[in-house]
């Protein structure tokens, strides 16, 4: 599923997703609260059918009212109900002994990857409490007025570049991807994190509009908001890590296949694939969703496919619309112009958007000092884990925040994704001080070039070695 985590290990799993929200180990039925949710329906629906503890914490930083509201919807489920609602028939006998007893969250989640530390009611951590206090003191968490004006100008630029592209102008192949990145990708990323505005409808409209030519909203929510932001750099859980494997090995815990290929070939093949990431976001991810739906109908879907299909199905119509717009982008030039010009108008924007995404977005996480054994990372409070699995650079530069849509400060962004990237440069000095106070060593680079260089070094080492022990020996 777009993008699925590994689901071929462990015991048999439920094939029918449940409809509950699992937070801090407790089960909640928030169905009746969806329409009343202040953050909008899309935000709350991301957590349905899964353990959404990290999501719940990440988007509720301004006060603690959410904890009181949440308790109104706590439910106690008998294990028998969990079995009939959630598990395959061949699993019912495994929990029948508990019939009549309260089902724990692990049984309800079922398909969720095993959590390392036990979930407890509201995990408080001094580091995260200081982060929340910092955000509250800052005040405005949504897009700043200068960036709103800038993006209005970008709309004009996007329309102009699309007009040139429609006319077949050579220059449009360079200008269009620029506006797709600084405007559309920014709208999808910030809007998808509900960070543009306090009004859910504004976030929704901007996200879905920007996604028409950049990615599929439903698949993006699944891979990015849920799998990546909740499980950053955890192998088998982080959708970004697993979406590249086995074609690209980007973590020491991942296997290296095929073993008979020279490491230099693996390394350069990896870089070549960077040019096609945009196709994965716009076409392959949605198609994998439809494969999951088809597998469900045939009864062959495993639990992970079923869970992910349920999440993306909430945005089925937008997935269809986005496939139509992307299809039109790739087909129209070949109907209007000669083959070479059509190839230029389609492939060059694809390459530029792909490189922008892979270099700017992935360079922060695929770094040796940002990767550690998943079992060790899972022992940390999730906020500390976010700070230790991202590399930052040019953090106090508004220009670089603009050019990278805030992805130059991913450690802070991952802790408070609901804060607009336009606010991050002003927050970063206080964030750095908080990290120093709590003994968290930030992973910093001088600039993007420096970060990209250490990223390449990481890929080179990973192309030759297998384990953390071997990697450490190489770097010693």
Curated annotation (Swiss-Prot):
Keywords: Fatty acid biosynthesis, Fatty acid metabolism, Heme, Iron, Lipid biosynthesis, Lipid metabolism, Membrane, Metal-binding, Oxidoreductase, Transmembrane, Transmembrane helix. One of its GO terms (cellular component) is membrane. Pathway: Lipid metabolism; polyunsaturated fatty acid biosynthesis. Signal peptide: none annotated. It catalyses: a (9Z,12Z)-octadecadienoyl-containing glycerolipid + 2 Fe(II)-[cytochrome b5] + O2 + 2 H(+) = a (5Z,9Z,12Z)-octadecatrienoyl-containing glycerolipid + 2 Fe(III)-[cytochrome b5] + 2 H2O; (9Z,12Z,15Z)-octadecatrienoyl-containing glycerolipid + 2 Fe(II)-[cytochrome b5] + O2 + 2 H(+) = a (5Z,9Z,12Z,15Z)-octadecatetraenoyl-containing glycerolipid + 2 Fe(III)-[cytochrome b5] + 2 H2O. A motif (Histidine box-3) lies at residues 410-414. Its EC number is 1.14.19.12. Front-end desaturase having a omega-13 desaturase activity for omega-9 unsaturated C18/C20 fatty acids. Strong substrate preferences for linoleic acid and alpha-linolenic acid for the production of pinolenic and coniferonic acids respectively. No desaturase activity for dihomo gamma-linolenic acid and eicosatertraenoic acid. PANTHER family: CYTOCHROME B5 HEME-BINDING DOMAIN-CONTAINING PROTEIN, FATTY ACID DESATURASE 2. This is Acyl-lipid omega-13 desaturase.
């Amino acid at each position: 599923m777009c993008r699925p985590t590994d689901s071929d290990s462990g015991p048999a799993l439920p094939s029918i997703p449940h409809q509950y929200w699992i937070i801090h180990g407790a089960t909640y039925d928030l169905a009746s609260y969806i329409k009343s949710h202040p953050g909008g329906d899309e935000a709350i629906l991301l957590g349905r059918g899964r353990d959404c503890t990290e999501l719940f914490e990440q988007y509720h930083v301004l006060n603690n009212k959410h904890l009181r509201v949440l308790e109104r919807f706590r439910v106690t489920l008998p294990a028998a109900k969990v079995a009939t609602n959630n598990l395959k028939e061949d699993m019912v006998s495994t929990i029948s002994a508990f019939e009549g007893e309260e089902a724990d969250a692990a049984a309800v989640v079922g398909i969720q990857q095993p959590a390392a530390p036990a979930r407890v009611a509201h995990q408080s951590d001094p580091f995260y409490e200081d982060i929340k206090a910092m955000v509250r003191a800052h005040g405005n968490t949504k897009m700043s007025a200068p960036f709103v004006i800038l993006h209005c100008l970008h709309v004009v630029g996007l329309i102009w570049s699309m007009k040139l592209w429609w006319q077949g102008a050579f220059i449009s192949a360079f200008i269009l991807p620029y506006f797709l990145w600084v405007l559309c990708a920014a709208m999808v990323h910030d809007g998808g994190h509900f960070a543009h505005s306090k009004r859910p409808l504004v976030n929704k409209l901007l996200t879905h509009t920007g996604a028409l030519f950049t990615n599929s909203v439903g698949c993006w929510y699944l891979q990015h908001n849920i799998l990546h932001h909740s499980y950053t750099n955890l192998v088998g859980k982080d959708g970004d890590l697993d979406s590249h494997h086995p074609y690209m090995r980007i973590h020491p815990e991942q296997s290296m296949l095929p073993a008979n290929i020279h490491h230099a070939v693996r390394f350069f093949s990896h870089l070549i694939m960077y040019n096609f990431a945009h196709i994965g976001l716009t076409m392959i991810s949605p198609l994998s969703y439809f494969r999951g739906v088809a597998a469900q109908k045939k009864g062959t879907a495993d639990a992970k496919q079923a869970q992910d299909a349920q999440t993306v199905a909430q945005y089925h119509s937008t997935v269809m619309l986005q496939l139509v717009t992307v299809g039109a982008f790739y087909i129209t030039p070949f109907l209007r112009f000669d083959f070479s010009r059509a190839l230029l108008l389609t492939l060059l924007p694809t390459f530029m958007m792909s490189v922008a995404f892979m270099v700017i977005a992935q360079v922060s996480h695929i770094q040796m000092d940002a990767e550690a054994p998943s079992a060790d990372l899972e022992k940390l409070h999730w906020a500390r884990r976010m700070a230790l699995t991202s590399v930052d650079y040019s953090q106090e530069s508004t220009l670089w925040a603009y050019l990278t849509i805030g992805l130059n400060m991913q450690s802070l962004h991952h802790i408070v994704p609901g804060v607009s990237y336009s606010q991050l440069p002003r927050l970063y000095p206080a964030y750095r001080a908080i990290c120093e106070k709590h003994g968290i060593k930030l992973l910093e680079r001088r600039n993007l070039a420096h970060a990209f260089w250490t990223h390449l070094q990481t890929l080179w080492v990973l192309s030759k070695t297998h384990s953390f022990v071997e990697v450490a020996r190489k770097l010693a």
